[in-house]
Design a protein with these regions (language model features):
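Extended, low-hydrophobicity, polar/charged segments
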Residues: 1-181
Length: 181
C-alpha cells in the first residue's frame, strides 16, 4: 500500500460518493493522506491500514432507536469494545441497535463496511446525530473511509471538528465509552 497526498489524480473507476468526498474536503482546504486497498469492511481488515497510515482507523457504527426515529453515528477507537447498554445510558435513549443498510444509504449515502463521518456531508436534513468517544477527540489525527471501503484517509482531528462538521451543519456530542463488562 502506498500513501498519497490528497485525492487521486484520476477518478476513473471510483464511485461518485468517493469523488464527492474529495471535492468536499478540497473545497474546505482540509489536507489529508490517502491509501487505496482491498475492501476493508471490518476492524480486523483495518489493522494493516492503521500501520500504513500511522493512525488508528475509527470504528464507526450507525445506530438507531427501536422506533427508528433517532439515528446516531458513533465514532470510537477501533480497539475499544462497543456496549449498547453503556452508550444508551449516556445518551438517555432506550434500546439502540444497528440501523438497516437502507437507512445508511438513505441518510449517509454509504453502504455497510464504509460507514464514516464523511457520510455526514450527505445528511442534508441533519437526521443523524454524531457521537464521538473522547479518546477519538484526544487524538491529533484520525482515520476514516471516504464513503467507500477501498480507500482510507488520515487527517487532523481539529480539521474534522472545526472545518468539516460546521460545513455539514452537524455538531457532535462527546461520550465516554469504557467498553468493559
Amino acid at each position: 500500500m502506498e500513501i498519497y497526498n490528497g485525492r487521486p489524480e484520476k477518478s476513473d473507476g471510483r464511485l461518485l460518493r468517493e469523488v464527492r468526498t474529495y471535492d468536499f474536503l478540497d473545497d474546505l482546504g482540509i489536507e489529508y493522506k490517502r491509501t487505496d486497498h482491498e475492501p476493508a469492511n471490518n476492524m480486523e481488515a483495518c489493522n494493516e491500514i492503521d500501520a500504513v497510515l500511522g493512525v488508528l482507523i475509527c470504528k464507526n457504527l450507525f445506530l438507531c432507536n427501536r422506533q427508528k426515529t433517532n439515528f446516531y453515528l458513533l465514532m470510537m477507537p477501533g480497539d475499544k469494545k462497543f456496549k449498547t447498554k453503556e452508550l444508551s445510558a449516556q445518551i438517555n435513549s432506550a434500546r439502540l441497535s444497528f440501523a438497516d443498510p437502507e437507512d445508511m444509504l438513505k441518510y449517509l449515502d454509504i453502504e455497510p463496511g464504509a460507514v464514516s463521518i464523511m457520510g455526514l456531508m450527505n445528511d442534508k436534513d441533519h437526521a443523524v446525530q454524531l457521537l464521538i468517544d473522547e479518546d477519538v477527540l484526544a487524538g491529533e489525527e484520525l482515520g476514516c473511509h471516504p464513503c467507500v471501503c477501498t480507500s482510507s484517509l488520515k487527517m487532523k482531528t481539529a480539521d474534522v471538528i472545526n472545518k468539516f462538521l460546521p460545513a455539514t451543519g452537524h455538531g457532535y456530542r462527546t461520550v465516554h465509552l469504557v467498553g468493559e463488562d
